[in-house]
Design a protein with these regions (language model features):
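Active-site loop segments of alpha/beta catalytic cores
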Residues: 1-136
Length: 136
């Protein structure tokens, strides 16, 4: 996975100062190794057209449903602040995500950004256990 954590800070300069090097890096990775690109704060529409990368990890600012039926793989987009919810709400969220994307072969569940220190690991566990029980 290529993490371009600050790519969203660039506007018109993104292609010249970031994407050009990402493409060069991706082209030098053997073809049997999948490449996933995460660019925080950048909508991936323009990136899709400018790269051969076929898997994108979305941050929480992008709309996953806008991309789900394209010929790319989508990962991420779950807002980790939702882990502040109570256990019942977390189980509901896991069920909603599972039901919405269970028939999509191009979706990988993942977070849209990192966990902050104030998130209770037990809450993450509740969510993941529910999601896992639904998918098995």
């Amino acid at each position: 996975q290529i993490f371009d954590s600050w790519g969203g800070m660039l506007d018109s300069e993104y292609e010249e100062f970031s994407l050009m090097y990402i493409n060069e890096l991706a082209e030098n990775i053997p073809g049997n190794i999948p490449v996933i690109l995460f660019t925080r704060g950048k909508k991936i529409d323009s990136i899709i057209e400018s790269t051969n990368i076929k898997c994108f990890n979305l941050d929480i600012s992008d709309n996953i449903d806008h991309h789900i039926d394209k010929s790319i793989v989508i990962q991420g987009n779950f807002d980790p602040s939702k882990f502040h919810s109570d256990a019942d709400k977390l189980e509901q969220l896991a069920t909603q995500i599972f039901e919405k994307y269970k028939n999509k072969n191009n979706y990988i569940f993942n977070l849209g950004s990192g966990l902050t220190p104030d998130i209770d690991p037990e809450k993450v566990g509740i969510f993941l256990e529910k999601l896992s029980s639904l998918s098995s």
